[in-house]
């Protein structure tokens, strides 16, 4: 199951706190990339945030990926389930 996660650091987070925790998040993302849980990650320019595509086996695994992020308590995120265009097209054809 693939998910798009858009994460932005809360504006009220002090710069010192953010600067301390951000390197921990970088290491965490590297670990998830090695485990093949993160397929893609990008920094959102000018947003103090990131965009990830994660590939997990369950909602429990997704919760773990999100909950263990060092910036979990200092960020807001939106999560979108993803599917391929081909699967979406197949589902639409079945409806017609």
Model features per residue range: what roles?
Residues 1-96:
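Conserved, structured core segments of small domains
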């Amino acid at each position: 199951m693939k998910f798009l996660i858009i994460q932005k650091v809360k504006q009220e987070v002090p710069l010192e706190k953010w600067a301390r925790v951000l390197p921990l998040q970088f290491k965490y993302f590297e670990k998830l990339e090695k485990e093949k849980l993160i397929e893609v990650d990008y920094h959102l320019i000018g947003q103090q945030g990131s965009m990830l595509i994660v590939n997990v086996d369950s909602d429990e695994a997704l919760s773990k990926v999100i909950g263990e992020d060092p910036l979990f308590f200092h960020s807001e995120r939106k999560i979108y389930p993803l599917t391929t265009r081909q699967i979406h097209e197949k589902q639409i054809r079945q409806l017609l």
